[in-house]
């Protein structure tokens, strides 16, 4: 059958097509949409750190008064970590090699942080913690860090203990990014990314908090799901016998196959890649996931963990993975440039523009 359209009809059709394409481009440029992003993941996966990065990147960072609000948390994190080290020494029946540290450990264990927000770390205690951290026995303890709970930022705080111990100590943004306090309930952060008005909801990661997530589930544009790659050899804070990575897999499976998220894209942050790189040569992934056969190769190990997560996606949602280091502002800035494109595309589809 011949072509029934005249040359003038064809030109008109082509012009109309070009006009439609231009209109779509114009609509996209003018497009302004509120996007609801749900930030999910198990406890200590880095969700709250991502929220802090959004404040630094998109909300002009922290004022001095806001930084001071984190001073007590930083001091508590430091002291808790030092006490965890002392308890680990006793658990493994080890003793410090430096004589002064054999006396320091009792003082560290008995030290209590003043609950007053204006409290500072005692100078003498700061020196004791610094001395313990420099003790030759410490590497032997750290080799067994998967056998006791020690927060990821412990080494960072120990390295900065003398600065933190100053009477006029004001946390900097790096301190704030590493400060850890349990997230309870639901917090909302609002910021703009280009033509997108983002409403980012951070929900508590601990088990007791998960029943509250239901309130956030309606009309979600995207989910950002955080997984700490470094947790493959760790146990849950809530239940010492449960592997953290296995728990994250169960949680991810329940999220991606939920009836609430049938049309939602999932942005998967494989977080704490820096700690993962340090840990893989020392703690074989195959010890915890026997079917893994890639050895200490960081890329193979990360790909295997990604594969484990994507295998749970029976609902066949679109999953966009990113390797992240939530404490590194430049890394998160780059990652969110890519995330913005994903969210924008989904928002345009939801609005019928694409």
Curated annotation (Swiss-Prot):
Output the Gene3D superfamilies linked to this UniProt entry. Answer: GI Alpha 1, domain 2-like (1.10.400.10), P-loop containing nucleotide triphosphate hydrolases (3.40.50.300)
- G4 motif: where is this region? 267-274
Residues recorded as binding Mg(2+), renumbered to this chain, are 48, 183
Q: Do you know which InterPro entries this protein is assigned to?
A: Fungi_Gprotein_alpha, Gprotein_alpha_su, GproteinA_insert, P-loop_NTPase
Subunit details? G proteins are composed of 3 units; alpha, beta and gamma. The alpha chain contains the guanine nucleotide binding site.
Ranges of residues in domain G-alpha: 33-354
Its biological function?
Guanine nucleotide-binding proteins (G proteins) are involved as modulators or transducers in various transmembrane signaling systems. GPA3 plays an active role in transmission of the pheromone signal.
Keyword list (alphabetical) reads: GTP-binding, Lipoprotein, Magnesium, Metal-binding, Myristate, Nucleotide-binding, Palmitate, Pheromone response, Transducer
The identity of this protein, by name, is Guanine nucleotide-binding protein alpha-3 subunit
Q: Where is this region: G1 motif?
A: 36-49
Region G3 motif, residue ranges:
198-207
Q: Which GO terms describe its molecular function?
A: G protein-coupled receptor binding; G-protein beta/gamma-subunit complex binding; GTP binding; GTPase activity; metal ion binding
Keyword Oxidoreductase on this protein?
no
Give the residue numbers of the S-palmitoyl cysteine lipid attachment.
4
Q: Does the keyword Nucleotide-binding apply?
A: yes
What segment(s) does the record annotate as region G5 motif? Answer: 324-329
Q: Which GO terms describe its biological process?
A: adenylate cyclase-activating G protein-coupled receptor signaling pathway; response to pheromone
Q: Where is this region: G2 motif?
A: 175-183
GO CC terms of this entry: cytoplasm; heterotrimeric G-protein complex
- By its UniProt entry, which SMART domains does this protein fall under? G_alpha
Please, where does N-myristoyl glycine lipid attachment map on the chain?
2
Question: Which domain of life does the UniProt lineage start with?
Answer: Eukaryota
Q: Which family does it belong to?
A: Belongs to the G-alpha family.
Where is GTP bound in this sequence? 41-48, 177-183, 202-206, 271-274, 326
Native species:
Mycosarcoma maydis
Q: Which CDD domains match?
A: G-alpha
């Amino acid at each position: 059958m011949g072509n029934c359209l005249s040359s003038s009809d064809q030109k008109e059709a082509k012009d109309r097509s070009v006009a439609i394409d231009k209109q779509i481009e114009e609509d996209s440029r003018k497009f302004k949409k509120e996007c609801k992003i749900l930030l999910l993941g198990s406890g200590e996966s880095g969700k709250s750190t991502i929220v802090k990065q959004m404040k630094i990147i998109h909300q002009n960072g922290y004022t001095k008064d806001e930084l001071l609000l984190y001073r007590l948390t930083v001091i508590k994190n430091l002291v808790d970590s030092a006490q965890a080290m002392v308890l680990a020494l006793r658990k493994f029946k080890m003793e410090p090699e430096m004589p002064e540290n054999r006396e320091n450990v009792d003082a560290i264990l008995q030290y209590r942080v003043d609950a007053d927000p204006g409290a500072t770390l005692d100078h003498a205690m700061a020196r004791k913690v610094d001395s313990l951290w420099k003790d030759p026995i410490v590497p032997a303890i750290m080799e067994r860090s998967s056998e006791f709970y020690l927060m990821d930022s412990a080494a960072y705080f120990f390295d900065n203990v003398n600065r933190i111990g100053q009477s006029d100590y004001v946390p900097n943004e790096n301190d704030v990014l590493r400060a850890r306090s349990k997230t309870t309930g639901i917090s909302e952060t609002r910021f703009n990314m280009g033509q997108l008005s983002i409403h980012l909801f951070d929900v508590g990661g601990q088990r007791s908090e998960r029943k509250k997530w239901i309130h956030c589930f309606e009309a979600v544009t995207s989910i950002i799901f955080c997984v700490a790659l470094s947790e493959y050899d760790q146990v849950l804070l809530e239940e010492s016998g449960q592997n953290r990575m296995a728990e994250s897999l169960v949680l991810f499976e329940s999220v991606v196959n939920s009836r609430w998220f049938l049309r939602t894209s999932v942005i998967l942050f494989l977080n704490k890649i820096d700690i993962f790189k340090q840990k893989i040569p020392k703690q074989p992934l195959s010890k915890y996931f026997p079917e893994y056969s890639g050895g200490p190769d960081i890329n193979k190990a990360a790909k295997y963990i990604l594969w484990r997560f994507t295998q749970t996606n029976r609902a066949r949602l679109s999953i966009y993975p990113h390797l992240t280091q939530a404490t590194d502002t430049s890394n998160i800035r780059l990652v969110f440039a890519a995330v913005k494109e994903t969210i924008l595309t989904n928002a345009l589809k939801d609005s019928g523009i694409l």
